C-alpha cells in the first residue's frame, strides 16, 4: 500500500496520477479537504481510500498501519510563505513529519518527503550544506528544521528529502496567490493581455529576477526514481539546475497566446528583505546519487502547461 500525503494538492495529485499510470491504484490519499475545490485534483485519479490528515496521523500513532505500508510520499504541508503563525506551522509541518519519519523507520517503509529551496533564503549558493541554509520565513524554517532533524537520525531505511525549487504545472490552481507565475501570467493575458511583473530589486533589472522554474512532471519523476532506488537516502535539490528570469516565463506565455505585453509594477515593501531574487539548484548531489533524468526549460514546458489549462474549467473562473 502506498500513502501520498497532500494528495489533493499540487505535487501530491500529480504523483497519484503518475502512480496510476504505472498501474498502482492501491493508494491511500491523505489531505485536508477544508477547501473542497481541491477534490478536482483527485477526481480523475484512482485511489483505494481517502483519509483526513488528522485521522491518518491518529491511526499511525495507534499502530493501525504497522507493517502495512510500502512507501510514504509526504507532500502535505502548509506551504504558504506568507503564513507567520509559527505554532501552527511547527505542528503542521515539523511535528507531523517527525511522526511519519519515526513510523517509517520502525516499519521498514520508504519515506520520501518534500523539503523546499526556501531553506536557502538569501543565500547565493544552493548546495545541500548547513552553512548555506538561511530561512527567511517560518515556512522555510519549518522545512529547514525537519531537514536538520533528519540529518541527526541514525537511519535504518530509506529517507529522502527533495528541496523543490519553483515548481509549476497542472493541478496548482487551488493555490491562489501561491500558484506559479506561469499560472497567473496566463490568467492575466486571458483577462486583459498584460503580464504584470515586479520592477527590479537587489540589483536586478525589471523582471530579470532569476528563479529555477521546474515543471511538476519532472519533480514527480525524481520522486518516483527515489522510490525505485531504495538504497538512496539524503537531502537533494530538485530543480532544473538552470535559473531563468520572470521575463522568460512571461514571454513564453505571450508567445503561446500570440498576444500581450509586459507591465512592470513597484516591488512591494512587505517583501523587501524576505524575497529570493535568485535561485538555482545545484544538482551535483542528485546526479552523484544516480539520477540521470533531464529537466524541461520554461520554453519547453510552459506551452504544455497552457495546453492543459485550456482544457480545464475551475470553480469561480
Swiss-Prot record:
Annotated function: Catalyzes the interconversion between ADP-D-glycero-beta-D-manno-heptose and ADP-L-glycero-beta-D-manno-heptose via an epimerization at carbon 6 of the heptose.
Domain note: Contains a large N-terminal NADP-binding domain, and a smaller C-terminal substrate-binding domain.
Annotated catalytic residues: 139 (proton acceptor), 175 (proton acceptor)
Pathway: Nucleotide-sugar biosynthesis; ADP-L-glycero-beta-D-manno-heptose biosynthesis; ADP-L-glycero-beta-D-manno-heptose from D-glycero-beta-D-manno-heptose 7-phosphate: step 4/4
Molecular-function GO terms, alphabetical: ADP-glyceromanno-heptose 6-epimerase activity; NADP binding
Name listed for the protein in its UniProt record: ADP-L-glycero-D-manno-heptose-6-epimerase
Binding site for substrate: 166, 177, 184, 198-201, 211, 275
Domain of life: Bacteria
Requisite cofactors: NADP(+)
Top enzyme class: isomerase
Alphabetized Pfam families for the sequence: Epimerase (PF01370)
Family membership noted in the UniProt record: Belongs to the NAD(P)-dependent epimerase/dehydratase family. HldD subfamily.
Annotated source species: Shewanella frigidimarina (strain NCIMB 400)
Amino acid at each position: 500500500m502506498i500513502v501520498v500525503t497532500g494528495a489533493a494538492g499540487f505535487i501530491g495529485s500529480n504523483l497519484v496520477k503518475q502512480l496510476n499510470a504505472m498501474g498502482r491504484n492501491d493508494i491511500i490519499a491523505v489531505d485536508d479537504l477544508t477547501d473542497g475545490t481541491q477534490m478536482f485534483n483527485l477526481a480523475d485519479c484512482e485511489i483505494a481510500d481517502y483519509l483526513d490528515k488528522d485521522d491518518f496521523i491518529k491511526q499511525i500513532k495507534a499502530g493501525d498501519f504497522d507493517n502495512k505500508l510500502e512507501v510514504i510520499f509526504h507532500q502535505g504541508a502548509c506551504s504558504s510563505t506568507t503564513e507567520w503563525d509559527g505554532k501552527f506551522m511547527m505542528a503542521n509541518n515539523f511535528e507531523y513529519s517527525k511522526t511519519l519519519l519515526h513510523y517509517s523507520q520502525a516499519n521498514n517503509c520508504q519515506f520520501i518527503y518534500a523539503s523546499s529551496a526556501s531553506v536557502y533564503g538569501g543565500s547565493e549558493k544552493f548546495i545541500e550544506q548547513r552553512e548555506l541554509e538561511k530561512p527567511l520565513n517560518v515556512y522555510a524554517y519549518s522545512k529547514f528544521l525537519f531537514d536538520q532533524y533528519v540529518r541527526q537520525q541514525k537511519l535504518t531505511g530509506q529517507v529522502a528529502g527533495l528541496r523543490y525549487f519553483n515548481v509549476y504545472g497542472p493541478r496548482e490552481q487551488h493555490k491562489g496567490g501561491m500558484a506559479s507565475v506561469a499560472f497567473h501570467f496566463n490568467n492575466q493575458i486571458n483577462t486583459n493581455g498584460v503580464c504584470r511583473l515586479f520592477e527590479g530589486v537587489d540589483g536586478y533589472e525589471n523582471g530579470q529576477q532569476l528563479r529555477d522554474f521546474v515543471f511538476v512532471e519532472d519533480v514527480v519523476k525524481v520522486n518516483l526514481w527515489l522510490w525505485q532506488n531504495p538504497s538512496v537516502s539524503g537531502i537533494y535539490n530538485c530543480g532544473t539546475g538552470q535559473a531563468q528570469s520572470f521575463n522568460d516565463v512571461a514571454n513564453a506565455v505571450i508567445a503561446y497566446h500570440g498576444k500581450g505585453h509586459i507591465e512592470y509594477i513597484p516591488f512591494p515593501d512587505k517583501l523587501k528583505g524576505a524575497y529570493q531574487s535568485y535561485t538555482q539548484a545545484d544538482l551535483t548531489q542528485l546526479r552523484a546519487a544516480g539520477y540521470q533524468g533531464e529537466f524541461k526549460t520554461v520554453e519547453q514546458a510552459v506551452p504544455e502547461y497552457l495546453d492543459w489549462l485550456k482544457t480545464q474549467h475551475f470553480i469561480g473562473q
